[in-house]
Amino acid sequence: MNKQITKELLEIGAVQINLDTYFTWTSGLKSPIYCDNRLTMSYPKVRKNIARAFILMLEQDGFKPDVIAGCATAGISHAAWLSDLLGLPMVYVRSKPKGHGKGNQIEGASVEGKTVLVIEDLISTGGSSIEAAKALQQAGANILAVYSIFTYGLDKSKDAFLQANIAYNSITGFDELIQELIGSGELSEEEKNELLTFRESL
């Protein structure tokens, strides 16, 4: 399933690599890899496979959540599809509380006393996912884990989740992407080394 989703993300252009002209991330960082999992919304087969992969991860981890929480904004749709398949309640978490109305950071029914799985589309440093999980904890939730579609596999993110004492897992990521591209002959050993050097620099 993971290998299939890696291939599908490449096929629809959700993950792209360009070693000649680097992409510019929101942070301003120049990168040879760009991930936009929002594209998966437009591909029913891909998004269904992603939801099924999340269910498989839950089964493998032995987790039984009461609630599925989506991280705003790209994690919301995947949390909705997953919660629908599981027949579970869903909430979503903003990066910060609203500046109007009730000033909610978490939208949906109360999560107090509930066991919650957090869904994120992408983990880079892990910062935004951890902040969402902490907001849920402050609201009285017990966090099972953060699940994402793709991870860059940075040491920085591993350390951050460890320090926050929050489990995390991802369907696919940087290492699986390289394996897929090497296997299909689309990436040379030299290009692979350039990508690995880039990741180590972060």
UniProtKB/Swiss-Prot annotation:
Quaternary organization: Homodimer.
Gene expressing this chain: pyrE
PROSITE patterns: PUR_PYR_PR_TRANSFER (PS00103)
Binding site residues for 5-phospho-alpha-D-ribose 1-diphosphate: 94, 98, 100, 120-128
MF-aspect GO terms: magnesium ion binding; orotate phosphoribosyltransferase activity
Stored PANTHER family: OROTATE PHOSPHORIBOSYLTRANSFERASE, URIDINE 5'-MONOPHOSPHATE SYNTHASE
Top-level class of the enzyme under EC nomenclature: transferase
Family: Belongs to the purine/pyrimidine phosphoribosyltransferase family. PyrE subfamily.
One GO term (biological process): 'de novo' UMP biosynthetic process
E.C. numbers: 2.4.2.10
Pathway: Pyrimidine metabolism; UMP biosynthesis via de novo pathway; UMP from orotate: step 1/2
Alphabetical UniProt keywords: Glycosyltransferase, Magnesium, Pyrimidine biosynthesis, Transferase
Function: Catalyzes the transfer of a ribosyl phosphate group from 5-phosphoribose 1-diphosphate to orotate, leading to the formation of orotidine monophosphate (OMP).
Species per Swiss-Prot/TrEMBL record: Oceanobacillus iheyensis (strain DSM 14371 / CIP 107618 / JCM 11309 / KCTC 3954 / HTE831)
The organism's taxonomic lineage, starting at the top: Bacteria, Bacillati, Bacillota, Bacilli, Bacillales
Protein name per Swiss-Prot or TrEMBL: Orotate phosphoribosyltransferase
